[in-house]
């Protein structure tokens, strides 16, 4: 069995699906760890092609031989809520000004999508987490 490679860096980025390019923020973040930037961009774009338009967080593990692996996460709850509510951005003062409404069904659907990345035991707990995110963005849950 090959010896286990040593991880020397962990990079977390949020990039639009299928749109990774060497420009900031991707280039500088990978460059300082000595990763082949174009190789990552091609691999990321190929892996996220089906989810174009969404922002997909990625966690990149960089090894001492400058190779890397990456794990894709689910889109941020805030982005999914904005899309469901049909508004461009959340409220500047969320507890005073409400910008939109979403139904519990939409919240549960987002919770289903996010379940693997949330620290929740069941869908109801995950839905409460998503509802809390909505509340802090000035989106009412009904």
Curated annotation (Swiss-Prot):
Domain of life: Bacteria
Signal peptide (residue range): none
GO biological process, one term: translation
PROSITE patterns reported for this sequence: RIBOSOMAL_L11
Gene Ontology terms for molecular function: large ribosomal subunit rRNA binding; structural constituent of ribosome
Assigned keywords, A-Z: Methylation, Ribonucleoprotein, Ribosomal protein, RNA-binding, rRNA-binding
SMART domains: RL11
GO cellular component term of the entry, any: cytosolic large ribosomal subunit
PTM per Swiss-Prot/TrEMBL: One or more lysine residues are methylated.
UniProt record similarity statement: Belongs to the universal ribosomal protein uL11 family.
Function of the protein: Forms part of the ribosomal stalk which helps the ribosome interact with GTP-bound translation factors.
Complex and partners: Part of the ribosomal stalk of the 50S ribosomal subunit. Interacts with L10 and the large rRNA to form the base of the stalk. L10 forms an elongated spine to which L12 dimers bind in a sequential fashion forming a multimeric L10(L12)X complex.
Alphabetized PANTHER family for the sequence: 60S RIBOSOMAL PROTEIN L12, LARGE RIBOSOMAL SUBUNIT PROTEIN UL11M
HAMAP family with a match to the protein in the record: Ribosomal_uL11 (MF_00736)
Protein name: Large ribosomal subunit protein uL11
Gene: rplK
């Amino acid at each position: 069995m090959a010896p286990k490679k040593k991880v020397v860096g962990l990079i977390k980025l949020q990039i639009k699906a299928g749109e990774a390019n060497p420009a900031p923020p991707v280039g500088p973040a990978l460059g300082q760890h000595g990763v082949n930037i174009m190789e990552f961009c091609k691999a990321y774009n190929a892996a996220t092609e089906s989810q174009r338009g969404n922002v997909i967080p990625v966690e990149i593990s960089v090894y001492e031989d400058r190779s890397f692996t990456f794990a894709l996460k689910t889109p941020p709850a805030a982005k999914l809520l904005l899309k469901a509510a049909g508004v461009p951005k959340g409220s500047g003062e969320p507890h005073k000004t409400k910008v939109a409404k979403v139904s519990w069904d939409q919240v549960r659907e987002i919770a289903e999508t996010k379940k693997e990345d949330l620290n929740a035991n069941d869908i109801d707990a995950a839905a409460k987490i998503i509802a809390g995110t909505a509340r802090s963005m000035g989106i009412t849950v009904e």
